[in-house]
């Protein structure tokens, strides 16, 4: 029995009449995805070791470099009309793209589960503060099922419905209100001059802080083309993505640092959530909590699109199955090793997209027309070289930082190997 192609089928280029996202749509989407409880908690990771000034510098530089790379990869989706994992076939070959698709599926299931866990913990905390610890509203199982179901339904509906009917019309304004409220509360109640003058305890090198900050935008590299493929123009894709994500991510991660230092210096797991719950009767935290479901939606939807490369099933059906899996994991797994999880993502996907960016913009000059191949060994070897470089630097020279050197080296290897082998042979055959 043949399966009717979905609008979101990964291998089908989006036709011109379906490319409806303008710059404002993409700004709204990426501003929203740059905001979330996990972004706040990532800022909390930096606070003790780097202090306020060091953390803000690491966040600024990491986010700036990260969003430029993210927006550039978004242009690939706009140029080709393909999903993120389908576009990798142009660089790695039809079979070579299966490995990153599988890795992406696994990491997105992890991200989706983490998002549900974070939402559950925050909602349970708000329920405990508003009612009592034993009340139904503080029940973590209830909230896990609620947020898992909500994120799954959003993922099944798809980004076209979500962005244009929900996020752009009212969602972004609620987010702005929450961020402004948290910012006002910080300036009103914290001694920022004292926090600024206080140095970190040195437990985290600046380069590691940069790597953690850049990991947030880079974590979206394997997803962005799933949404930018619906963009009308490449320049709007680049601008809307870069500006939207930079503002949201820098703002919220900085608030995570400041709130941790000002109101939650104990370093306990729920200390930051308690501090946020105390601001504005918990309403800003509630609004950001609702936004977190958008991040989980993106993880589940893109996991379904990635698995569509491996399984010839309808994306909507895959989204339903993956949403159930994420919810089950959230019920059973603790929130631990988050920092290592972020760095591991950077070790695999940052070098990969160094290869992809060089291949698309320099070697193929933004063309989607390439000779078919099952495996493109030069690109695969360049990727392997980048991943090896990342782990070598991270283990032997942690003060140097690993993400950017690995990405740049992988790109340079692709430039050299691609010209010497794949593209050289294709030119010779022509």
Q: What do the PLM-derived regions correspond to, one by one?
A:
Residues 1-56, 204-210, 229-236, 420-430:
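Membrane-interface "cap" regions at the ends of multi-pass membrane proteins
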Residues 23, 27-39, 183-190, 198-259, ...:
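Hydrophobic, membrane-embedded alpha-helices of multi-pass small-molecule transporters
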Residues 47-49, 75, 99, 121, ...:
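Membrane-water interface regions at transmembrane-helix termini and the short interhelical loops
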Residues 59-92, 102-116, 418-427:
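Juxtamembrane transmembrane-helix boundary signature
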Residues 101, 129-158, 173-183, 205-224, ...:
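Transmembrane alpha-helical segments of multi-pass small-molecule transport proteins
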Residues 116, 120-121, 155, 173-199, ...:
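Hydrophobic alpha-helical segments and their helix-loop junctions in multi-pass secondary transporters
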Residues 142-185, 238-245, 342-354, 404-412:
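Membrane-interface loop-to-helix entry segments
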Residues 353-430:
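C-terminal membrane-solvent junction of multi-pass transporters and transport-like membrane proteins
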């Amino acid at each position: 029995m043949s399966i009717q192609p979905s609008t979101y089928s990964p291998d089908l280029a989006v036709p011109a009449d379906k490319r409806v996202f303008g710059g404002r749509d993409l700004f709204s989407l990426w501003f929203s995805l740059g905001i979330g409880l996990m972004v706040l908690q990532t800022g909390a990771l930096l606070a003790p070791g780097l202090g306020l000034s060091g953390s803000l510098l690491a966040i600024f530089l990491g986010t700036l470099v990260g969003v430029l790379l993210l927006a550039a990869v978004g242009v690939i989706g706009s140029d080709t009309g393909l999903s993120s994992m389908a576009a990798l076939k142009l660089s790695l070959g039809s079979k070579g793209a299966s490995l990153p698709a599988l890795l992406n599926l696994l990491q997105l299931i992890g991200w989706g589960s983490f998002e549900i866990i974070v939402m559950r913990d925050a909602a349970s905390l708000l329920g405990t503060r508003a009612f009592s610890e034993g009340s139904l509203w503080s029940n973590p199982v209830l909230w896990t099922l609620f947020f898992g179901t909500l994120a799954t339904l959003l993922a099944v509906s798809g980004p076209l419905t979500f962005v244009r009917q929900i996020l752009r019309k009212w969602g972004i304004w609620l987010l702005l209100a929450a961020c402004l409220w948290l910012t006002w509360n910080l300036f009103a109640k914290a001694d920022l001059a004292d926090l600024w003058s206080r140095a970190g305890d040195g437990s985290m090198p600046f380069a590691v802080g940069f790597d953690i900050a850049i990991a947030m935008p880079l974590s979206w590299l394997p997803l962005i083309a799933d949404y930018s493929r619906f963009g009308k123009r490449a320049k709007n894709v680049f601008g809307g993505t870069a500006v939207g994500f930079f503002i949201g991510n820098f703002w919220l991660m900085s608030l995570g640092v400041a709130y941790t230092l000002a109101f939650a210096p104990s370093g306990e797991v729920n200390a930051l959530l308690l501090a946020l719950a105390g601001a504005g009767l918990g309403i800003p935290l509630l609004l950001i909590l609702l936004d977190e479901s958008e991040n989980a939606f993106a993880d589940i939807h893109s996991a379904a699109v990635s698995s569509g490369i491996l399984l010839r099933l309808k994306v909507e059906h895959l989204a339903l199955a993956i949403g159930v899996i994420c919810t089950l994991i959230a019920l059973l797994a603790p929130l631990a090793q988050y920092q290592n999880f972020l760095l591991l993502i950077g070790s695999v996907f940052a070098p990969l997209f160094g290869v992809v960016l060089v291949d698309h913009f320099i070697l193929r000059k933004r063309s989607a027309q390439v000779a078919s191949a099952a495996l493109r060994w030069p690109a695969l070897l360049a990727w392997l070289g980048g991943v090896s470089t990342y782990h070598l630097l991270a283990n032997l020279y942690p003060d140097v930082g690993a993400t950017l050197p690995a990405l740049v080296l992988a790109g340079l290897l692709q430039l050299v190997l691609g010209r010497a082998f794949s593209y050289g042979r294709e030119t010779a055959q022509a």
